[in-house]
Regions:
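Catalytic cores of processing enzymes, dominated by hydrolases/peptidases
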Residues: 120-176
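N-terminal catalytic or cofactor-binding beta/alpha core of small enzyme domains
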Residues: 1-111, 117-127
Length: 176
């Protein structure tokens, strides 16, 4: 469930959602940090779930705290980031995926981008990260298959290396 930092009503309808998954390493987390800091995203709240591990970090500007599941929005580009920095509690992944799926459907996002690492190594070089971090597009329609990636949200955690080849890099999200 989305918890806003302010009392104003926030609608995600017709915006795109960006989130990441990573089996090992933190190149995807680094990519999200680059996206946020280089594209004027602002923190608008967080995703509350009992399934998420607790974590608190300083914001990049050092002026506020950020939680596991923080939401960031770039209104001009109609992009929203869900930053799952602390991970999901052990044995609660299925429940979390169900909660997240329901939230995404209820929020009426127009597109969903899953950022996943194609490398198991930690990479901190910006140019290398741009080559290793791929974007996967998901549809809420289980019958729609886009670029032979995944059919629906629950399949996001079953991506093979073959499906990762030749996909969009994170920089391509910001080409106009």
């Amino acid at each position: 469930m989305f918890k806003s930092k302010t009392s104003e009503k926030i609608s995600f309808e017709n915006t795109s959602l960006i989130l990441f998954f990573s089996g090992k390493g933190n190149s995807t987390s680094f990519a999200l940090s680059l996206l946020r800091s280089n594209n004027n995203f602002k923190n608008i709240g967080y995703f509350y779930s009992e399934c998420l591990s607790s974590s608190v970090n300083y914001s990049s500007d050092g002026k506020s705290l950020e939680f596991n599941g923080s939401f960031y929005i770039n209104e001009s580009k109609k992009l929203t980031i869900l930053d799952l920095t602390g991970g999901v509690k052990s044995r609660e992944l299925n429940d979390f995926v169900d909660e997240l799926t329901k939230f995404i459907k209820d929020s009426k996002f127009s597109k969903i981008y899953i950022i996943g690492s194609s490398s198991k190594d930690n990479v901190f070089d910006v140019d290398l990260v741009s080559k290793l971090v791929n974007i996967y597009y998901l549809s809420n329609d289980p019958n729609e298959k886009i670029n032979c990636n995944m059919k629906n949200i629950k399949e996001a955690f079953k991506v093979t290396d073959e499906e990762r080849k030749g996909k969009t890099y994170y920089r391509d999200l910001f080409k106009n």
